[in-house]
Amino acid sequence: MRKIEFFDTSLRDGEQTPGVIFSIAEKVTIAKQLEKWGISVIEAGFPAASPDSFEAVKQISKALKETAVTALARCVITDIDKAVEAVREAQHPQIHVFIATSPIHMKYKFKISPDEVLKTIDKCVRHAHEQVEVVEFSPEDATRTEPEFLLKAVQTAVDAGATYINIPDTVGYTTPEEYGKIFKMLIDNIKADREIIFSPHCHDDLGMAVANSLAAIKAGAGRVEGTVNGIGERAGNAAIEEIAVALHIRKDYYQAKSPLVLAETMATAELISQFSGIAIPKNKAVVGANAFAHESGIHQDGVLKNAETYEIISPELVGIKHNSLPLGKLSGRHAFTEKLTELNISYDAKELPNLFERFKRLADKKKEITDADIHALFTGETVKNLAGFILNNVQIDGHKALVELKNQDAEIYVSQGEGSGSVDAIFQAIDKVFNYQLKLISYSVDAVTNGIDAQATTVVSVENLATGTIFNAKGVDYDVLKGSAIAYMNANVLVQKENSQGKVEQISAHDGI
């Protein structure tokens, strides 16, 4: 049975979701979890886009041991050189180059001829292959490219040294039947003296990203690309967890399997949700809260008698398990570290005293600490440590608020605000510290643990009126007002960074596949 490689682009294409900005520390944490999950290759970023993107790829390259790391580059020599430099320290480096091949992109986006595109492919793939052995080529907007020219473009890339050929459905235009035919045409006609592995990269504009990806695998693709929870610009990307579970449940049909440790699926999905600030829809396949819930009495009766009557996926398969070792205020450091090990949570030993101290403070507030609490505690710590400012204190008196912030130079800022309510007052006080022109687009609170004493994630979306950039920022705390203050403070830190360094993404977010 064929083993399909899984290529995760949550850190690159997923970060193109409006408002989603992962810090470098968050990206490294996510990458380590993706490696634990069994992902074959991680697209860590677009190094030419910004200094932060370059540094993130570099740090991830150093951190991973088994999973390959790739970096995206346009078919531009300087882009490729940046990508090569960024992955230089990876154990298994790869480079991913792309150029658009559809008539509409060549005519209106690049204003170049098909012959010029072919020459550029040959030049840039050769340049990449001279420096890194494994090169992937993507003809952007492949599904709207004329078949004859698509074949020429792919053959040119293969002749120049590409080992992987990715066929992006950039605008989510194709259907499963059409997409399968494209793969069959390429697999049957591309000439090479070595194995060439084809992969789908699907967007979900028509709601068919996962179906299209599976159709490509059925047609012979050996690798599949996607993101955790299907995050991505517009309607998102193919959800990797859905593809992996579909291959597992229907291996009889696809005759293929994934390399993923499926028991790590829920932990991975929750981590991405926490760091992106995008809640997992309750009715989402595989990882949604309702995926294993049964309202109908007939269904409930059937499941109680035999779970397979209405469940084709067991909760345990994707890592949903009962809280086997609950913690409380009397639990010691050993029990806490044992729980981190049980939950497969990676952490730096230097972080342990601070994490344990936060655990003890939480235990004073909650009678019983659940697994979800521990995950929230861990992700909240990463969010809290967003470089720039720390919330020392927040006090509320009716419609008035006092906040105390500390910057990375240990300078203390105390500010007061007055608003229509407690949250508005907090935001007004924080505005006086930073004094940026922001527009609050959305504010939401989502309980990440159960019970009246639950921890919650507060997410704010703000627009930097100086640039038009939208940022999502998070705050995790059992005190909703404190979580709100952390989230809004972090949003201001992101705006501060953009205003001081110039636009975070100097290359358009639409420069991708």
Curated annotation (Swiss-Prot):
Chain's role: Catalyzes the condensation of the acetyl group of acetyl-CoA with 3-methyl-2-oxobutanoate (2-ketoisovalerate) to form 3-carboxy-3-hydroxy-4-methylpentanoate (2-isopropylmalate).
Assembly mode: Homodimer.
Listed under GO cellular component are: cytoplasm
Q: Which residues does the annotation say bind Mn(2+)? A: D13, H201, H203, N237
Q: What family is this?
A: Belongs to the alpha-IPM synthase/homocitrate synthase family. LeuA type 1 subfamily.
Organism field: Lactococcus lactis subsp. cremoris (strain SK11)
Q: Extract the ranges annotated as region (Regulatory domain).
A: 390-513
Q: Which N-terminal residues, if any, form the signal peptide?
A: none
GO MF = 2-isopropylmalate synthase activity; acetyl-CoA C-acetyltransferase activity; manganese ion binding
| Cell compartment(s), UniProt | Cytoplasm
Q: Which PANTHER family match?
A: 2-ISOPROPYLMALATE SYNTHASE 1, CHLOROPLASTIC-RELATED (PTHR10277:SF9), HOMOCITRATE SYNTHASE-RELATED (PTHR10277)
Pathway, per UniProt? Answer: Amino-acid biosynthesis; L-leucine biosynthesis; L-leucine from 3-methyl-2-oxobutanoate: step 1/4
Which one GO biological process term can you cite for this protein? L-leucine biosynthetic process
Q: Which cofactor does it need?
A: Mn(2+)
Does the keyword section mention ATP-binding?
A: no
Q: Show the InterPro entries listed in the entry.
A: 2-IPM_HCS-like, 2-isopropylmalate_synth_dimer, AIPM/Hcit_synth_CS, Aldolase_TIM, LeuA/HCS_post-cat, LeuA_allosteric_dom_sf, LeuA_bact_synth, PYR_CT
* HAMAP family tied to this protein: LeuA_type1
Q: Known SMART domains for this protein?
A: LeuA_dimer
Q: Give me the reactions it catalyses.
A: 3-methyl-2-oxobutanoate + acetyl-CoA + H2O = (2S)-2-isopropylmalate + CoA + H(+)
Record key words, sorted:
Amino-acid biosynthesis, Branched-chain amino acid biosynthesis, Cytoplasm, Leucine biosynthesis, Manganese, Metal-binding, Transferase
Enzyme Commission code: 2.3.3.13
Q: Specify the Pyruvate carboxyltransferase domain's residue ranges.
A: 4-266
> What protein does this entry describe?
2-isopropylmalate synthase
